[in-house]
């Protein structure tokens, strides 16, 4: 099959719609269940490239959670702590390596991952399928599925859950095309290989140390950015992206957005948040929304009398600004990637507040000296990769 008709394009009025191979060859995908749409396939093809490159760079199973053609989260399989199992709501499950990777990718920013598209570098097993079964998700792409996993996935969304199988050996044409306003754009594919050598070739700060964990996390950040709508910045820790700032016109706004998401990820681990007394059988999306509001400055929206009773068995004490500030002071050993250079040191100042210790960015700003000086002030390690990672 070299063509697949779709219901419509980005919006219901955009018809007809299809995906097809310009060279007449077979499509590299097979729809095993459901009817994926135009945006579903944009997410699928972008996200699978991301996880395939993460697997190649780290040697570990990888997963991504995509929304609107940018990753909400991405991760490689690592051992989850009891704390992370609890905040990702998987402490009651036995997790395989690929299931752990998806739990991390989904868990980093659960608000943004609501209704996500899932990508796996490895075969989807029944543990991953059971994890997905209880989450709100639009679909999944993977190189294969075990029979048990496929059976579970086919029960989601009353049997309409989108399941796509992709040829893991598929190699796209070296030249890609895109039409905008009736004009065809042509460019070479971004086949840049992101690896440790790129990180080590030009460390510009006084501190030259890059731990093995930092190298892994910087690779995760940069590969995530390669498939994130620009401008973009990514914070990573423990084998996963913990904050992605996508599609901002200003670099500092990317850094703030991603940093705020990373802060929320860490605040979810605060003892007060982990011990919230939720009512029995609260829906997972309601729990996620409640936690998000509880952590924010608008906590009264879920703690006001007549409201808290919907969510909690007993009224919790608020998480105060002072408590949040003190907790965030313990945030550390975070890695940060940027898809283009930092024009000023203010980005580093903001990153420091979210525990950043390691930075990878292209360099090339006329104020590189200011950025380096700011890193040196905090004894950070910063690598200039010399490579821009814009994606549109």
Predicted stretch roles:
Residues 1-198, 214-232:
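Active-site loops and adjacent core secondary-structure elements that bind or stabilize anionic groups
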Residues 72-111, 242-341:
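Glycine- and Gly-Pro-enriched alpha-helical subdomains that act as flexible
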């Amino acid at each position: 099959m070299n063509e697949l008709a779709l219901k419509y394009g980005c919006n219901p009025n955009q018809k007809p719609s299809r995906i097809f191979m310009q060279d007449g060859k077979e499509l590299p995908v097979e729809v095993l269940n459901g009817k994926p749409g135009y945006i579903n396939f944009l997410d699928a093809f972008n996200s699978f490239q991301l996880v395939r490159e993460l697997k190649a760079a780290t040697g570990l199973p990888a997963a991504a959670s995509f929304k609107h053609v940018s990753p909400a989260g991405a991760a490689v399989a690592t051992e989850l702590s009891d704390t992370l199992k609890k905040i990702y709501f998987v402490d009651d499950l036995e997790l395989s390596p690929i299931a752990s990777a998806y739990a991390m990718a989904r868990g980093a920013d659960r608000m943004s991952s609501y209704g996500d598209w899932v990508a796996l570098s490895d075969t989807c097993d029944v543990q991953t399928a059971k994890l997905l079964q209880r989450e709100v998700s639009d679909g999944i792409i993977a190189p294969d599925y075990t029979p048990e996993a496929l059976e579970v996935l086919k029960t989601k969304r009353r049997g309409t859950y989108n399941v796509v199988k992709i040829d893991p050996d598929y190699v796209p044409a070296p030249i890609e095309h895109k039409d905008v306003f009736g004009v065809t754009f042509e460019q070479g594919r971004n086949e840049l290989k992101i690896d440790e050598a790129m990180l080590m070739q030009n460390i510009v700060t006084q501190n030259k140390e890059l731990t093995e964990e930092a190298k892994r996390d910087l690779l995760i950040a940069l590969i995530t950015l390669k498939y994130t709508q620009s401008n973009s910045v990514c914070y990573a820790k423990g084998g996963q992206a913990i904050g992605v700032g996508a599609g901002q016109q200003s670099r500092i706004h990317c850094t703030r957005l991603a940093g705020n998401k990373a802060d929320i990820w860490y605040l979810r681990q605060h003892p007060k948040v982990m011990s919230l007394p939720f009512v029995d059988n609260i829906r997972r999306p309601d729990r996620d929304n409640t936690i998000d509001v509880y952590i924010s400055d608008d906590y009264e929206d879920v703690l006001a009398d007549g409201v808290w009773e919907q969510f909690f068995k007993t009224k919790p004490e608020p998480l105060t600004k002072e408590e949040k500030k003190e907790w965030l002071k313990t945030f550390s050993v975070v890695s940060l990637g940027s898809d283009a250079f930092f024009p000023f040191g203010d980005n580093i100042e903001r990153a420091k507040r979210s525990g950043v210790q390691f930075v990878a960015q292209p360099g090339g700003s006329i104020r590189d000296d200011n950025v380096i000086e700011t890193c040196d002030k905090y004894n950070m390690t910063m690598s200039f990769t010399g490579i821009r990672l814009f994606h549109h």
